Amino acid sequence: QGVPMPLLLVCEDNGIGISVRTPQGWIARTYGNRADLEYFTADGADVAEVLTVSQRAADYVRTHRRPAFLHLRTVRLMGHAGSDYEPGYRSGDEITADYGRDPLLGTARILVETGICTVAEVLDAYEAKRTDVLALATDVAELPQLDSPHAVMTPLREARDDAVRATREAASRADRRDDGPAVTVAQAINRALRETLTDHPEALLFGEDVARKGGVYGVTRGLAATAGAARVFDTLLDEQSILGLALGAGVCGLLPIPEIQYLAYLHNAADQIRGEGATLQFFSNRQYRNPMVVRIAGYGYQKGFG
């Protein structure tokens, strides 16, 4: 669609997914020759190389305003998770070889070889950081637990109750004269979306067929011409991508209005809504929020689709 997309995707490729190994060269073959996606790669164990290649990738994205893929070949240390017994499916030699590529050790090696630090200074810095981390862990472990429904719900409560209340009251007092021509529900929603796009320059509306076609029921017809292609645009037929874009736009200070075309497609994005959108405010203790308005068609022509 020609819309600038300055996006840098970073793949930390440790070559294994829990116990299943990635086919040799699969990442490079899959992403190395994609149209409109510039590919960069570096050895994740070599911090100097990572810095150089990362700078090149970032410069490309900023200069061309196009996406790039940064492939970092890394290692996985100490298994997939606390319950993962790595020696059950990997040999001791493989595990030991990974520790030889630990980027932390690689950084220490560079510091010593370039004369920036002595071995003793590196070890002292490491032990000092260990002390700091253990002290922080002790402090966190002693924090009060969430022991009541009120404590659990507090991070989810509206952070600006007064502003929300004032907006709700203003809407209830709005001029509701009905002496004009009757409109359909679709036309009323279209007007509301048009007013939102006009009054809020940070608002974006996107989804399947919402721009050029104007939605499968015509609800978004004409909005792309009003707000422009950068604010009202069609997406891939992928609900996870639609909601993922909305989540990212929300925390960037924008007002995303993603559309799920039919209710039957909602389950494709259930994890983004339940596992990300609905919990971000809780897990960040209200430091981050997801101010998105998810639109799903209702009163559709076919039972089960809206």
Language-model segments: which ranges?
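Glycine-rich ThDP/TPP pyrophosphate-binding loop and its adjacent helix/strand module
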Residues: 1-135, 142
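Thiamine diphosphate
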Residues: 2, 25-26, 153-306
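A generic structural-conservation signal
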Residues: 9, 41, 120-121, 149-150, ...
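Flexible loop/turn segments at secondary-structure boundaries
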Residues: 16-19, 48-49, 76-80, 147-148, ...
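A broad detector of short, well-ordered amphipathic alpha-helices
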Residues: 52-55, 138, 218, 244
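A glycine-rich phosphate-binding loop feature that marks nucleotide/adenosyl-phosphate handling sites
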Residues: 71-78, 126-129, 150-160, 293-296
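Short coil/loop linkers at secondary-structure junctions
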Residues: 117-118, 146, 230
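Outer-membrane beta-barrel domain signature, strongest for Gram-negative TonB-dependent receptors
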Residues: 133, 137-139, 143-155
